[in-house]
Amino acid sequence: MKVIKVENQVQGGKVAFEILKEKLANGAQTLGLATGSSPLEFYKEIVESNLDFSNLTSVNLDEYVGLDGDNPQSYRYFMQENLFNQKPFKESFLPRGVKDNAEAEVERYNQILADHPVDLQILGIGRNGHIGFNEPGTPFDSQTHLVELDQSTIEANARFFAKIEDVPTQAISMGIKNILDAKSIILFAYGESKAEAIAGTVSGPVTENLPASSLQNHPDVTIIADAEALSLLEK
């Protein structure tokens, strides 16, 4: 596991973009993508570049259950606004947040992931150490599944909604096994609120109580983080 300390998210995006270019030069075909504020500067680097993504495939980590793709709070909408509209891929797959047939969607998405092995997976990390929407207690051998979101996750995401009652309580997420199946992984972490999770991810015991600690079992993980997120690691 490699840890790269950066000044801020802008520098973090540039560092990640250099890693991406190296992977593409070595034949990467499929990118695993994440939402949230952490990868935004990385996506800006992609959009502003002259790289052609029209022969590449993307798969996203997760999606809320109960939000249509045209809902501004859906992850599909986020990806369209921040990346896909400006830099189209050959194919871009996201879980569909269908409420009535979630189990069928789980099966569909697991098949997509089997058909499109991820070369480089992008991750953020939750305060409780979740990756994707894999909350504490998620088995490390899990594949795509329906998730009941932790209250801490709902509260963290409430800032994007008019009121906390509007935040979805379920999501469809890649499992931890799906994430670990990627050839390479970049995890972004910014801010003091992520410090405890990062300390456990890098140097704590590998435990299902901290989903991101599973990354210690992966051969090619790069953590890009600022001083605040690394503050407990450096003491």
Swiss-Prot record:
The keyword Transport does not apply. Its EC number is 3.5.99.6. GO terms for biological process: carbohydrate metabolic process; glucosamine catabolic process; N-acetylglucosamine catabolic process; N-acetylneuraminate catabolic process. Signal peptide: none annotated. It comes from the Bacteria. Keywords: Carbohydrate metabolism, Hydrolase. It catalyses: alpha-D-glucosamine 6-phosphate + H2O = beta-D-fructose 6-phosphate + NH4(+). GO terms for cellular component: cytoplasm. Belongs to the glucosamine/galactosamine-6-phosphate isomerase family. NagB subfamily. Catalyzes the reversible isomerization-deamination of glucosamine 6-phosphate (GlcN6P) to form fructose 6-phosphate (Fru6P) and ammonium ion. This is Glucosamine-6-phosphate deaminase. The lineage of its organism: Bacteria, Bacillati, Bacillota, Bacilli, Lactobacillales.
